[in-house]
């Protein structure tokens, strides 16, 4: 995964891209918690992207009971079933087998990519991804990174981008789980993802309220 400048971006046509209010990259415990929390607040136009062929991450591999989330301990696969049922009941879109290769922060002329969409300037991130069918593009107003521990290079790039975003007065990039703190346990990652999902969800709802939706 590479964070790139939009100066180097060859803009795809709007009809070649998928537009969402919220993009969550990573379908592990923190990503599932994040998009579930946002959906619970009423965010409907969201999309979860996972590079593996199934959701769950550590929840599908770990066998140790998880404590600290509920009154009693739960098995990882029980928690995964809980999230899967939530996504189904709330009809939360998600795609597997999607590997995000490049992330672009849209600014200046690059925002013209959303010229056919309402509120074009609200779209902040473009993701170039690889699937079995080929390359595709995802564009979102907010981006949650829940991809596990970042490499040192990725961590520096994300930190720099977050600092750059602060200048806009409206941050739209949010690391969660092990992307935020590599040593997080499953319970901590779920809590982190849920907190980030609520923060982003509340931000998007406030914006819609201001626009009269």
Q: What is each residue range found by the language model?
A:
Residues 1-213:
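Residues forming the flavin
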